[in-house]
């Protein structure tokens, strides 16, 4: 939506880990059978996948034109690799899905929303280091247990 308003053109072709148009798959050393996913979520299925989840959920609000979002995308994939089934990581394209960002007052990108039991428990606006993100997730998982 913002891309259309401001006449922004899509960025050049992306590297495989930057392509957020599909489910993003990462694989650890054990091979393809242990593939883990960062799931793309839309306005229509946000409540079912995120709000009703019994796990800690990390929601990555991103946009194609947002360069820092590319870095955050890699971090969310690393979270899946490092924490596995302990949490659910989803990504929502704010240009294609404007209802959910408006409902949660998402004003800047990238934004990570941390939810547990349908309630927002934390929020990160802007970049941070992966180590800072790990510390935040570890603390939230401990308090959710």
Predicted regions located by residue number:
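N-terminal targeting signals for export/organelle localization
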Residues: 1-36, 145
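Typically the conserved alpha-helix immediately C-terminal to a functionally engaged Cys/Sec
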Residues: 68-83
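Hydrophobic beta-strand anchors of alpha/beta hydrolase catalytic cores
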Residues: 58-59, 89, 112
